[in-house]
């Protein structure tokens, strides 16, 4: 069966779904806490600083220290070290770190309408409706900041990020768990030699990313059987000098056979690439009171005789606001 990456909005019955999956399949669970603890051992960063990577709020000095980006590099490296078995569920933010090239992993999103989430929060945490709303809005802001940081997508429930989106206001936990288990057992998501190589590539890319971070650099990193491609997403005054510096650092990482550098889609923006000079976090996503979620299944998981799933309107009504 496939690796399960489960991301969820707050108060969407994630705990119950995960527990049902574990009891049914015997899967092991990897949590954000597990990944952060492993990251702390690899780096000189505290668990508090590493957990801060999952938050919409960053240190006021992050623009200069790039603490959040460095934390993400170490979180990836730590996660790669936990991938020693195929049958486990990664619950939380950490699952979104896993390379999409690992085809024997399926991404799941649990989300629900605001009314049911508020009801769950009031019941589970003895909050007022107003307190529950604020808590959910803050949590959604963290989720939006995370998907923006990783994918430049400010809607954390965007179906394009997942293989399945399950509306938990319409499903019971056991129903959702059964859907996930059934899809995780499909032949299309079984491990192959290519997908196992993708796990090795993910670790190598993480090692390169950490090596660059230690030297004050942050750029896109992709690995393919020892060949590493670095994507520069910020303009720089002397591009060739930067390319050589990045190649020199990446080339010293064990397992790297060749290094390529390319410029990304943001290269021609007006900001300038410098060490320790990174844009501030994205604004926080507001909760849309009227948003209704529908069940979606990625193309690779759709059976042959099933009609195409209705696509959710990407132009959501969510607004982005600053939390200063």
Where are these regions (language model features)?
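Conserved phosphate-donor/acceptor-positioning beta-strand/loop module used by diverse small-molecule
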Residues: 103-123
